[in-house]
Amino acid sequence: MRCPFCAHPEDKVVDSRESKEGESIRRRRECLKCEKRFTTYERIDEIPYMVVKKDGRRERFDRQKVLNGLMRACEKRPVSIGKLEAIVNEAETFVIDSPERERRTSEIGQLIMEHLKKYDKVAYVRFASVYLDFKDVREFLSELQDLLNHKDPAAVATVKPIK
């Protein structure tokens, strides 16, 4: 390990312990040349969880991206950040539980819409208008009509497994 201060290649480990989360090892090191101390972290290099986009591209699952989309949909709505975090947690668990370590964005979006439909119909419509990518006003009105016709907020489509 090179010293970040003088670039000397040799150091000694002064202290070593697990991080607070238990997912890494924190090591306190001292340079053998300049005697300055610095901290390093050692962790397992994990295979990332992936999402498959509509066009077939794959990218890493980004929890913050999901939360940002939900926050935009729920802006100025009475949906607590706690509920949004719970939805994001469920979406993340849904991706993590996949044996292939990937899920389609359509599956994740459907799961999120199911929750929004229960919590706040306006937020649901906002999210659906972006997620479902309506081609014209008729498609949008059709979705609104379906929403108005459902008396039971739990009456929503189920998530289909990846094939």
From Swiss-Prot:
Signal peptide: none annotated. Binds 1 zinc ion. A zinc finger (unnamed) spans 3-34. Its cofactor is Zn(2+). GO terms for biological process: negative regulation of DNA-templated transcription. The keyword DNA-binding applies. It holds the Pfam family ATP-cone. Keywords: ATP-binding, DNA-binding, Metal-binding, Nucleotide-binding, Repressor, Transcription, Transcription regulation, Zinc, Zinc-finger. GO terms for molecular function: ATP binding; DNA binding; zinc ion binding. Residues 49-139 form the ATP-cone domain. Negatively regulates transcription of bacterial ribonucleotide reductase nrd genes and operons by binding to NrdR-boxes. Belongs to the NrdR family. This is Transcriptional repressor NrdR.
